[in-house]
Amino acid sequence: MSKQSALLSAPSSSLLLEVVDGALVIQHWGAPLSGDLASAQSAIRPSIANSSWDVPQFPGIMRESSRGFLGRPSVSGHRNGKAWSTKFEVSNFHHVGNHVAITFTDFHAQLEVVITFDLDVHGVLQQRATLKNFGDGDYSLNEYIHWLPLPKEATQTLDFAGRCKQLLLCEV
């Protein structure tokens, strides 16, 4: 797979997305990045501590046990007791301006996730996701979790979860 990345920029913030080993990784979300994309990617690459992996590990935005993530997975469910562990791979990457649409596919679980990111001129990031079952049988979805890294400076999160667009403001 060729290296795919996208830089979404606003005067107050930037979002740098990169496909690493088939997973979508948020390399940077915070202060504006300047210069070329290659320099930015090189500058934000984490260092490797002694007695650690040989290369930095990036579990990706889709938290999955198949990629070594030990917490709650992004997609929790099963297909009649099977396909309970997913491994989504980026199958389509579309970037135009400050909009990115990424399609993830797990052919074993027969699921597809489309996640879009939009960064407006004020630096507000909007993320949307849809999950599609393209298999013949039913898929029992227990939970789908959106995940975004928060910068150290963050003191509040704003969540418009659910269909009724209720406002939920949480102190971090």
Question: Can you name each region flagged by the protein language model?
Answer:
Residues 20-21:
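Contiguous, structured surface segment used for ligand recognition
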Residues 4-7, 13-15, 25-172:
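Polysaccharide-binding surfaces and accessory modules of carbohydrate-active proteins
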